[in-house]
Regions:
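Non-catalytic C-terminal accessory modules of carbohydrate-active enzymes
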Residues: 56-59, 78, 89-181
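Extended glycan-interaction surfaces of carbohydrate-active proteins
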Residues: 1-85, 117-118, 173
């Protein structure tokens, strides 16, 4: 068994685009819970990453792209499998939030953001495959994950389904304008 962090990426894309659930919800939730449990590491000191270890290393934490919780890891790992990518961390975190697992999602975000504290890494440049690489823009899904704010331009409907209790204010951006909700 392999725990791939992006195993239900298409389901996340369908959710943030308003398509709705495509896969069985229980299986999606089970997958994301397993990824949170097995792939999120608070300390990578004992983790060997022979590829590009500067994304996360030493006592830093991160969400590993792939794990083998029941054994069976390849002797020669496939490319990138041992890495931490902010774009995948944000994707998994926002998907967890969209499914009501807000604390688990926030735990991933905090672990990720702790690496970009301005001492070792630029907090405004979550580099993965070059500076200002676009995958980290999946962080935009965190707004929807927490606030449930999504605008459907086809039907001209603003959806607001907050996952946090109490009043809040959120950023909103559409093709024709932006503001706060």
């Amino acid at each position: 068994m392999r725990g791939e962090a992006d195993g239900v990426l298409g389901e996340w894309m369908a959710a943030v685009c308003g398509v709705g659930e495509v896969l069985d919800r229980e299986k999606t939730e089970s997958h994301l819970r397993a990824v949170h449990r097995h792939n999120l590491k608070k300390d990578l000191t004992a983790h060997a990453n022979p590829q590009r270890p500067t994304f996360a290393y030493g006592a830093e934490g991160g969400l590993l792209l792939c794990t083998w919780p029941r054994g069976g890891a390849l002797a020669l790992p496939f490319v990138y499998s041992n890495e931490v990518w902010t774009g995948i961390e944000y994707q998994v975190a926002s998907h967890l939030m969209l499914l009501g697992m807000v604390e688990e999602g926030l735990e991933i975000v905090r672990t990720c953001r702790d690496r970009y504290d301005g001492r070792t890494r630029n907090p405004f440049d979550e580099y993965e495959c070059g500076h200002w690489y676009a995958r980290a823009m999946s962080s935009y899904g965190l707004i929807q994950g927490l606030t449930g704010v999504r605008y459907d331009a086809v039907d001209r409907i603003l959806h607001v389904e907050p996952r946090l209790p109490g009043d809040f204010r959120s950023f909103l951006s559409t093709a024709t304008g932006y503001g706060t909700v």
